């Protein structure tokens, strides 16, 4: 038995609860299981270490002994007084298959390496218009499919998997550790109860090969940037007939040239001429549904916010719809003709002294006078 600390092996504190230990074990067992890491000796060793740690820490009496005596509790020359624990053999032995049955829906205590497929996470980029109105997208995801040479059996065509010679088909073996007799997953067949003597040359005994699957994603109207869509059963395929995992699609919304989104509302800048700002007028403004008319009142200043009701984004969870807010920017004309310059100069002359026509300028001058008086 390895002398590595069992708690460190599972990555839990010494005060960890039974549920925390079980959760940590499940995660590591799935990560390092030989079926998921074929021909990976390092993963196989890690899997064995995780097994040993869980076999001890999942049993209250064994855990108590380990907490008190460490690894010496399971060695022949350990502390005295352990004879009373001889009952760990036989029916009270550790059944490694139980935990896998709970994890993956197996039946009896026999170890069942039927792993639910992994969840798959992918991202997709859509336009603001698509996010506002909803859209269907087709995406390609990496997956596995049954081997077309062996039809998923993993065995060379013309042959069949044989009963495992090590466990005789039970999927488990018994090992003796000092005074303890424990049951664990068969190291030869990894709990399947069968052994492939002549593996398929294409899938090398796995029964499946890498593939690409096309999935249609229904993106609902009103979805926001960063939200996820879950497609049940569209993730990685299960092993040996277990259910597939789920597919999680994270939505990213491409930056728009005109609009910025804030929840259900949209915002945009609306440039207007200084003549329209002074006299008022009617303008066409863009929305996600096309152009609409907007009346600009006279004497409008830069920074004024005008609302176009109901031209925002539809709510994902209710019948509400946001609004469009146009932020006015009064533009100073450039590249003036001589005639335009003459008219502006004339306008400036006849406006001199009419401070009530420029309230912000008057307020600024009043503040200057107060500052220096």
Swiss-Prot record:
GO cellular component assignments: cytoplasm
Q: Which cofactor does it need?
A: Zn(2+)
One family from Pfam that matches here is DnaJ_C
The record ties this protein, via NCBIfam families, to: DnaJ_bact, PRK10767.1
Q: Which Gene3D superfamilies match?
A: DnaJ domain, Heat shock protein DnaJ, cysteine-rich domain, Urease metallochaperone UreE, N-terminal domain
Q: Which gene is annotated as encoding this protein in its UniProt record?
A: dnaJ
Naturally occurring in which organism (per UniProt): Neisseria meningitidis serogroup B (strain ATCC BAA-335 / MC58)
Q: What is this protein called?
A: Chaperone protein DnaJ
User: Where does the record place the J domain?
Assistant: 5-70
Which SMART domains does this chain map to?
DnaJ
Question: Where is it predominantly found?
Answer: cytoplasm
Write out the domain note. The J domain is necessary and sufficient to stimulate DnaK ATPase activity. Zinc center 1 plays an important role in the autonomous, DnaK-independent chaperone activity of DnaJ. Zinc center 2 is essential for interaction with DnaK and for DnaJ activity.
Q: Keyword set for this entry?
A: Chaperone, Cytoplasm, DNA replication, Metal-binding, Repeat, Stress response, Zinc, Zinc-finger
